Amino acid sequence: MNIGVIFAGGVGRRMNTKGKPKQFLEVHGKPIIVHTIDIFQNTEAIDAVVVVCVSDWLDYMNNLVERFNLTKVKAVVAGGETGQMSIFKGLEAAEQLATDDAVVLIHDGVRPLINEEVINANIQSVKETGSAVTSVRAKETVVLVNDSSKISEVVDRTRSFIAKAPQSFYLSDILSIERDAISKGITDAIDSSTLMGMYNRELTIVEGPYENIKITTPDDFYMFKALYDARENEQIYGM
């Protein structure tokens, strides 16, 4: 069984959206979160979707599920106090749906430019190696800095990747790590791959498209609109 856990728990302070969380902003009559879920909905390999939503917008999210006929969404749950705790709540909901050896794909609700090919590659990577971290090759040089803002290391660009999403694992594995981490007071890991790395788990890269952006700022929003229109018009992709 393959389950998408889609995190839509942010409130979008950097988007200046005057109260509406960024995941609910509309592009061509459809909220960003629905654009994202649609990809999972239309991917044959996905059996179910769990949406983790900011608590004050649960009813709104449930209405979107009904309005857009998102039949693979089997649960909409409230997020936690941190991103990690929100994902944990989504994983717990997935556990209620799962069969043995379920694969879970943890994805950002504001990454609507994912595609079926990457989703399928994530599932295959988990089955072969136990993990999948969707990533892109770094286009520019990455440097590490110290507390004095001095460069302490220049990272070899040929070995540098930027981690994105989905980040995918066997559900039982990530839940086991989450529960142990929480029991030790670790509740704010930046993402699931970071948490798994803290436990020295082997992580495998799945290369994804550069356009798999996370919509965080107004610039990101307008970039998504442009890329979406380009896809729709078939003027750029596939050339």
From Swiss-Prot:
Catalytic activity from the UniProt record: D-ribitol 5-phosphate + CTP + H(+) = CDP-L-ribitol + diphosphate
PROSITE patterns referenced in this protein's UniProt entry, alphabetically: ISPD (PS01295)
UniProt binding sites for CTP: 7-10, 80-86
Transmembrane regions: none
Superkingdom to which the source organism belongs: Bacteria
Enzyme Commission identifier(s): 2.7.7.40
InterPro entries: IspD/TarI, ISPD_synthase_CS, Nucleotide-diphossugar_trans, TarI
Single Gene Ontology MF annotation: D-ribitol-5-phosphate cytidylyltransferase activity
Residues carrying the site annotation Transition state stabilizer: 14, 22
Listed GO biological process terms: cell wall organization; isoprenoid biosynthetic process; poly(ribitol phosphate) teichoic acid biosynthetic process
GO CC list: cytosol
EC top class named in words: transferase
Keyword Nucleotidyltransferase: yes
S-S pairs: none
Pathway(s) where this gene product acts: Cell wall biogenesis; poly(ribitol phosphate) teichoic acid biosynthesis
Site (Positions ribitol 5-phosphate for the nucleophilic attack): 157, 214
Keywords: Cell wall biogenesis/degradation, Nucleotidyltransferase, Teichoic acid biosynthesis, Transferase
A Pfam family per the record: IspD
PANTHER family given in the database record: D-RIBITOL-5-PHOSPHATE CYTIDYLYLTRANSFERASE (PTHR43015:SF1)
Function summary: Catalyzes the transfer of the cytidylyl group of CTP to D-ribitol 5-phosphate.
Family membership: Belongs to the IspD/TarI cytidylyltransferase family. TarI subfamily.
HAMAP family the record matches: TarI (MF_02068)
Protein name stated in the entry: Ribitol-5-phosphate cytidylyltransferase
Organism the protein comes from: Streptococcus agalactiae serotype Ia (strain ATCC 27591 / A909 / CDC SS700)
